[in-house]
Amino acid sequence: MFNNTVDQSFAIVRPPGHHSHSNLAAGFCYFNNAAVAAKVAQKEQGSRKIVIFDWDVHVGDGTSQIFYGDDTVLYISIHRYDNGKFYPGPKGSEKQVGMGKGKGFNIQYPFNLNPN
């Protein structure tokens, strides 16, 4: 991708690092792999369209926070929510859609296994 030999790419990354915020390690995540890769792709390679698709039992609250006001990265998360009672708490509501220029670029698909 970075040397112009492919037009598109896809990576499956473990561990996700998605609880690590821009200024806070959390959920056993010390750095946010996807956010670092996205920023490097933008800065060093001029990538303009980046999608981070996070499918995990927990919301990627760190990744969401890092790109919350950013319209250059589309962040999509599918995660367990249980009405805000599942880790990491109320973060990851379908109402959290981004802010400013990033509004609409932060998409949350929470599901409830325990609706109470």
Feature locations, PLM:
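Conserved alpha-helical scaffold segments that buttress catalytic/binding sites
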Residues: Q8-N116
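Fold-level signal for large, globular catalytic cores of enzyme and receptor domains
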Residues: M1-T5
